[in-house]
Protein backbone atom coordinates (compact mmCIF):
# COMPACT_ATOMS: atom_id res chain seq x y z
CA UNK A 1 0.00 0.00 0.00
CA UNK A 2 1.37 3.40 -1.02
CA UNK A 3 1.96 6.00 1.69
CA UNK A 4 1.25 9.73 1.44
CA UNK A 5 2.71 12.24 3.91
CA UNK A 6 0.50 15.25 4.63
CA UNK A 7 2.23 18.39 5.87
CA UNK A 8 0.73 21.39 7.67
CA UNK A 9 -2.35 19.40 8.65
CA UNK A 10 -5.05 20.42 11.08
CA UNK A 11 -7.51 18.07 12.82
CA UNK A 12 -10.24 18.86 10.27
CA UNK A 13 -7.84 17.91 7.45
CA UNK A 14 -7.24 14.51 9.04
CA UNK A 15 -10.96 13.89 9.47
CA UNK A 16 -11.71 14.76 5.86
CA UNK A 17 -8.86 12.79 4.29
CA UNK A 18 -9.48 9.74 6.49
CA UNK A 19 -13.18 9.78 5.60
CA UNK A 20 -12.50 9.84 1.85
CA UNK A 21 -9.46 7.54 1.78
CA UNK A 22 -11.43 4.29 2.20
CA UNK A 23 -8.21 2.43 3.00
CA UNK A 24 -6.67 2.97 -0.43
CA UNK A 25 -3.51 4.63 0.91
CA UNK A 26 -1.63 4.74 4.15
CA UNK A 27 -1.77 8.35 5.34
CA UNK A 28 0.78 10.01 7.62
CA UNK A 29 0.01 13.44 9.04
CA UNK A 30 2.43 16.10 10.22
CA UNK A 31 1.55 19.45 11.75
CA UNK A 32 4.90 20.82 10.53
CA UNK A 33 5.15 22.76 7.29
CA UNK A 34 7.11 21.12 4.47
CA UNK A 35 10.63 22.55 4.64
CA UNK A 36 14.13 21.35 3.94
CA UNK A 37 14.37 20.28 7.59
CA UNK A 38 11.02 18.45 7.75
CA UNK A 39 11.20 16.72 4.35
CA UNK A 40 12.92 13.71 5.97
CA UNK A 41 9.68 12.93 7.82
CA UNK A 42 8.34 11.61 4.49
CA UNK A 43 10.94 8.83 4.28
CA UNK A 44 9.22 5.73 2.92
CA UNK A 45 6.38 7.71 1.34
CA UNK A 46 5.61 7.69 -2.37
CA UNK A 47 4.04 11.17 -2.24
CA UNK A 48 3.80 14.26 -0.07
CA UNK A 49 0.80 16.55 0.14
CA UNK A 50 1.66 20.19 0.84
CA UNK A 51 -0.47 23.22 1.59
CA UNK A 52 -0.39 26.75 0.22
CA UNK A 53 2.15 28.07 2.76
CA UNK A 54 4.69 25.30 2.23
CA UNK A 55 7.65 26.51 0.18
CA UNK A 56 8.76 23.77 -2.20
CA UNK A 57 12.09 25.14 -3.34
CA UNK A 58 15.28 23.47 -4.63
CA UNK A 59 16.33 22.35 -1.18
CA UNK A 60 12.98 20.65 -0.47
CA UNK A 61 12.86 19.03 -3.92
CA UNK A 62 16.39 17.64 -3.49
CA UNK A 63 15.58 16.39 0.02
CA UNK A 64 12.43 14.65 -1.22
CA UNK A 65 14.34 13.11 -4.14
CA UNK A 66 17.00 11.74 -1.79
CA UNK A 67 14.42 9.82 0.25
CA UNK A 68 12.56 8.46 -2.79
CA UNK A 69 9.45 10.66 -2.89
CA UNK A 70 8.12 10.73 -6.47
CA UNK A 71 5.13 13.06 -6.26
CA UNK A 72 4.23 16.41 -4.67
CA UNK A 73 0.49 17.01 -4.31
CA UNK A 74 -0.72 20.54 -3.59
CA UNK A 75 -3.90 21.20 -1.58
CA UNK A 76 -4.34 24.53 -3.36
CA UNK A 77 -4.96 25.85 -6.85
CA UNK A 78 -1.94 28.14 -6.82
CA UNK A 79 1.58 26.88 -7.40
CA UNK A 80 3.72 29.99 -6.97
CA UNK A 81 5.23 28.34 -3.88
CA UNK A 82 6.83 25.61 -6.04
CA UNK A 83 10.01 25.91 -8.11
CA UNK A 84 8.46 24.19 -11.13
CA UNK A 85 11.48 24.69 -13.40
CA UNK A 86 13.72 22.94 -10.91
CA UNK A 87 11.13 20.24 -10.22
CA UNK A 88 10.83 19.36 -13.93
CA UNK A 89 12.45 15.99 -14.51
CA UNK A 90 13.12 15.51 -10.79
CA UNK A 91 9.68 15.15 -9.19
CA UNK A 92 6.09 15.36 -10.43
CA UNK A 93 3.90 18.16 -9.07
CA UNK A 94 0.09 18.04 -9.13
CA UNK A 95 -2.34 20.70 -7.92
CA UNK A 96 -6.03 21.38 -7.54
CA UNK A 97 -7.11 22.33 -11.07
CA UNK A 98 -9.50 25.09 -10.00
CA UNK A 99 -11.92 26.21 -7.37
CA UNK A 100 -15.60 26.76 -8.00
CA UNK A 101 -16.13 29.91 -10.07
CA UNK A 102 -18.95 30.77 -7.68
CA UNK A 103 -16.91 30.42 -4.47
CA UNK A 104 -15.96 34.09 -4.10
CA UNK A 105 -19.47 35.32 -4.90
CA UNK A 106 -21.01 32.84 -2.46
CA UNK A 107 -18.61 33.90 0.28
CA UNK A 108 -19.37 37.58 -0.40
CA UNK A 109 -23.10 36.89 -0.11
CA UNK A 110 -22.56 35.02 3.15
CA UNK A 111 -20.67 38.02 4.55
CA UNK A 112 -23.42 40.40 3.42
CA UNK A 113 -26.02 38.25 5.18
CA UNK A 114 -23.82 38.12 8.26
CA UNK A 115 -23.83 41.92 8.41
CA UNK A 116 -27.47 42.37 7.42
CA UNK A 117 -28.78 39.87 9.95
CA UNK A 118 -26.34 40.98 12.67
CA UNK A 119 -25.26 37.38 13.15
CA UNK A 120 -21.94 38.21 14.76
CA UNK A 121 -23.59 40.53 17.29
CA UNK A 122 -26.10 37.79 18.05
CA UNK A 123 -23.33 35.26 18.48
CA UNK A 124 -21.42 37.49 20.89
CA UNK A 125 -24.54 38.18 22.93
CA UNK A 126 -25.60 34.55 23.20
CA UNK A 127 -22.07 33.57 24.15
CA UNK A 128 -22.53 35.87 27.16
CA UNK A 129 -25.98 34.34 27.86
CA UNK A 130 -27.76 37.50 26.70
CA UNK A 131 -30.72 36.25 24.69
CA UNK A 132 -32.59 39.54 24.33
CA UNK A 133 -33.25 40.73 20.81
CA UNK A 134 -33.63 44.46 21.42
CA UNK A 135 -30.57 45.62 19.46
CA UNK A 136 -30.72 42.89 16.86
CA UNK A 137 -34.19 43.51 15.45
Model-derived features: where do they sit?
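Phosphate-binding beta-alpha-beta segment of Rossmann-like dinucleotide-binding domains, i.e.
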Residues: 91-137
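An N-terminal-biased, well-structured beta-alpha scaffold segment characteristic
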Residues: 2-93
Amino acid sequence: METIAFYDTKPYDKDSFDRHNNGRYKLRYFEDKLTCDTAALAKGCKAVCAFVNDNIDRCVIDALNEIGVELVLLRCAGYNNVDLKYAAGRIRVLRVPAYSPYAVAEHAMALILLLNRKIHKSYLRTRDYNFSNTIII
